[in-house]
């Protein structure tokens, strides 16, 4: 037994003093966790949240182009030229429009703007225009310009929509008037006109002389004849009659002709569309701020490089894709396995099987070594850089896969188009659900691939070292190699950088292996001898026990008798 103990201690002494090199990976005190398809809450050294949840809370310039806030005027009040909105008449360019939903100055005369939602949608795609006079009021003939107390200007004087002319009788006459606008601007032109529907026939005759006037509007492709629909309607601003305002986009080279003998709101100013683009009309009471953003929502600007956002589906600009999720983390580091505090005999270094290394700097994978000069640790920058490139490609691929052509139209329509709004809502919700599901599934798959990639990279590095060392080392099975020769720091560096020459140390390694194998054989021989002795003694004890048991049984049954003679 003494020989066995001595042999074992000798083997331990050889192992402890051997030079060693280990392959391992980084571990940190990170609390980051990600989900995969097969597992939730996997600890990782690092991750990024792909969903942006923060915004500026203000309206900002979009990519350097300022928005326009309509102030106290609604979109309709601005377009038709409410006299209280003259400060907005100089607007020419914007990145998007902001409308206060409670703006007091809309249509000052009771009525409506026909196809209001469609016009709003059109203006969502306009970046700049110029207001220009289409037909001078004096060119129509023997009619007068009408004004109303419902539409007062900033001085309190009766006025009317500045982009329209309300013609009434002159000298108790209202002849048939007619004019044509020919679009020679080379651009699309927005033309407005309207029809006044009086309370009664008497009011009709008072204003227009004719009891049943008409208005005819026609272009090359369509024609519309309007008749007055008299009747009392719910009103405001002291008026009970009604005005309906129409619009049309006249393309270059097209003409539009107007003919009327009463109830006609003639076009005066129109808008030359100078630039189309991608915009939006946000309805909010939030005012503008001096800031710049690349993505604007109804609640604030988003400045982020993240792939997704959960702030607003109606975002404008270079925006992350909207999904319904609070958090979506993509693994960018390794599976985080805490380091083992006390490794091996006398705190010896250990490889990746026994956990990560907290001291690894500037790399995800690397080497630890132990020799007569001490211990050292170094990152393998080449394999780390390859992994970083792979993850960068992953993130870019996710962005590319999630870039779709779908744009929400929600928010461009008013109360008149409730069915369109309902349909838009359903489409938005369905598409958002699909995007959200696809995004989550994609990230879960990529997290699985990332963690598998890191495991494979560590094993590849281990296999690379094993091929270099060949028979000059013993693979301990835990990510470490026990070198069978002396290996100083320079020697360790050749193993790390792939320039190690195993033939240089082959003879020394062969002798060391024979020495270790001899100690193992002698130890095993002593073990076998000890086992033989123990086996013999155990067998004898069992045999004696059996004989004594037989004798006691025989005596108790009367088959055995002792005679004592004196």
Swiss-Prot record:
A Pfam cross-reference name: Hemagglutinin
Membrane topology: Single-pass type I membrane protein
Alphabetized GO MF terms: host cell surface receptor binding
Cytoplasmic side stretches: 554-566
Known glycosylation sites: 29, 54, 182-183, 305, 488, 497
Alphabetical keyword list: Clathrin- and caveolin-independent endocytosis of virus by host, Clathrin-mediated endocytosis of virus by host, Disulfide bond, Fusion of virus membrane with host endosomal membrane, Fusion of virus membrane with host membrane, Glycoprotein, Hemagglutinin, Host cell membrane, Host membrane, Host-virus interaction, Lipoprotein, Membrane, Palmitate, Signal, Transmembrane, Transmembrane helix, Viral attachment to host cell, Viral envelope protein, Viral penetration into host cytoplasm, Virion, Virus endocytosis by host, Virus entry into host cell
TM segment ranges: 533-553
Record site feature (Cleavage), residues: 343-344
Extent of the signal sequence: 1-18
Record keyword Glycoprotein present: yes
Gene3D superfamilies the record matches: 3.90.20.10, 3.90.209.20
Residue positions bearing lipid (S-palmitoyl cysteine): 555, 565
Disulphide bridges, residue numbers: 22-480, 60-291, 73-85, 108-151, 295-319, 487-491
BP term (GO), one: virion attachment to host cell
Superkingdom field: Viruses
GO cellular component, one term: membrane
Modification note: Palmitoylated.
Compartments, as annotated in UniProt: Virion membrane; Host apical cell membrane
Extracellular compartment residues: 19-532
Subunit structure: Homotrimer of disulfide-linked HA1-HA2.
Family: Belongs to the influenza viruses hemagglutinin family.
Function of the protein: Binds to sialic acid-containing receptors on the cell surface, bringing about the attachment of the virus particle to the cell. This attachment induces virion internalization of about two third of the virus particles through clathrin-dependent endocytosis and about one third through a clathrin- and caveolin-independent pathway. Plays a major role in the determination of host range restriction and virulence. Class I viral fusion protein. Binds to sialic acid-containing receptors on the cell surface, bringing about the attachment of the virus particle to the cell. This attachment induces virion internalization either through clathrin-dependent endocytosis or through clathrin- and caveolin-independent pathway. Plays a major role in the determination of host range restriction and virulence. Class I viral fusion protein. Responsible for penetration of the virus into the cell cytoplasm by mediating the fusion of the membrane of the endocytosed virus particle with the endosomal membrane.
Miscellaneous section: Major glycoprotein, comprises over 80% of the envelope proteins present in virus particle. The extent of infection into host organism is determined by HA. Influenza viruses bud from the apical surface of polarized epithelial cells (e.g. bronchial epithelial cells) into lumen of lungs and are therefore usually pneumotropic. The reason is that HA is cleaved by tryptase clara which is restricted to lungs. However, HAs of H5 and H7 pantropic avian viruses subtypes can be cleaved by furin and subtilisin-type enzymes, allowing the virus to grow in other organs than lungs.
Designated name of the protein: Hemagglutinin
């Amino acid at each position: 037994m003494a020989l066995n103990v001595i042999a074992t201690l000798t083997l331990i002494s050889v192992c402890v003093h051997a030079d060693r090199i280990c392959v391992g990976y980084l571990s940190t005190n990170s609390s980051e966790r990600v989900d995969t398809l097969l597992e939730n809450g996997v600890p990782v050294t690092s991750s990024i949240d792909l969903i942006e949840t923060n915004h500026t809370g203000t309206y900002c310039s979009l990519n350097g182009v300022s928005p326009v806030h309509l102030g106290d005027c609604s979109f309709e009040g601005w377009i038709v030229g409410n006299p209280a909105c003259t400060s907005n008449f100089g607007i020419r360019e914007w990145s998007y429009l902001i409308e206060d939903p409670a703006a007091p100055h809309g249509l000052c005369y009771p009525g409506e703007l026909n196809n209001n939602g469609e016009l709003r949608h059109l203006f969502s795609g306009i970046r700049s225009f110029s207001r220009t006079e289409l037909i001078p009021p004096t060119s129509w003939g023997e009619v007068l310009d009408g004004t109303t107390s419902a539409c007062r200007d900033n001085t309190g004087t009766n006025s009317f929509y500045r982009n329209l002319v309300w013609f009434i009788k002159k000298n108790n006459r209202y002849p048939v008037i007619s004019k044509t606008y020919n679009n020679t601007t080379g651009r699309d032109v927005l033309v407005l006109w309207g029809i006044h529907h009086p309370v009664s026939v008497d009011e009709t005759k008072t204003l227009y002389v004719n009891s049943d006037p008409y208005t005819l509007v026609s272009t090359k492709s369509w024609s519309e004849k309007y008749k007055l629909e008299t009747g009392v309607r719910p009103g405001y601003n002291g008026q009970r009659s009604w005005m309906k305002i129409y619009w049309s986009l006249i393309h270059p080279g097209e003409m539009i002709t107007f003919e009327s003998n009463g109830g006609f709101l003639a076009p005066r100013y129109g808008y030359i569309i100078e630039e189309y683009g991608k915009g939006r009309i946000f309805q909010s009471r939030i005012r503008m701020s001096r800031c710049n953003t690349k993505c604007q929502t109804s609640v604030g600007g988003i400045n982020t490089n993240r792939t997704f956002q959960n702030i607003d589906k109606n975002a404008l600009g270079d925006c992350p894709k909207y999904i319904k999720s609070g958090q979506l983390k993509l693994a960018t580091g390794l599976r985080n396995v805490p380091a083992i505090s006390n490794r091996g005999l006398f705190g010896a270094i250990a490889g990746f099987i026994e956990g990560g290394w907290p001291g690894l700097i500037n790399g995800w994978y690397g080497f630890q070594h132990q020799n007569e000069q001490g211990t050292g640790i170094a990152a393998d920058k080449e394999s780390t850089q390859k992994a970083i490139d792979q993850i960068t490609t992953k993130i870019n691929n996710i962005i590319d896969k999630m870039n779709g052509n779908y744009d929400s139209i929600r928010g461009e329509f008013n109360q008149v188009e409730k069915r369109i709004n309902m349909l838009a809502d359903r489409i938005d919700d369905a598409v958002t659900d699909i995007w959200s599901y696809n995004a989550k599934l994609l990230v879960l798959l990529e997290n699985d691939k990332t963690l598998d990639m890191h495991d494979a990279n560590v094993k590849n590095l281990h296999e690379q070292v094993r091929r270099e060392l060949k028979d000059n080392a013993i693979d301990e099975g835990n990510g470490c190699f026990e070198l069978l020769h002396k290996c100083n720091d320079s020697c360790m560096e050749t193993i790390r950088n792939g320039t190690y020459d195993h033939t240089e140390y082959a003879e020394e390694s062969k002798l060391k292996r024979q020495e270790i194998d001899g100690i193992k054989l002698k130890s095993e021989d002593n073990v076998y001898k000890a086992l033989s002795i123990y086996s013999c003694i155990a067998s004898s004890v069992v045999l004696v026990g059996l004989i004594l048991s037989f004798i006691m049984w025989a005596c108790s049954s009367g088959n055995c008798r002792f005679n004592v003679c004196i």
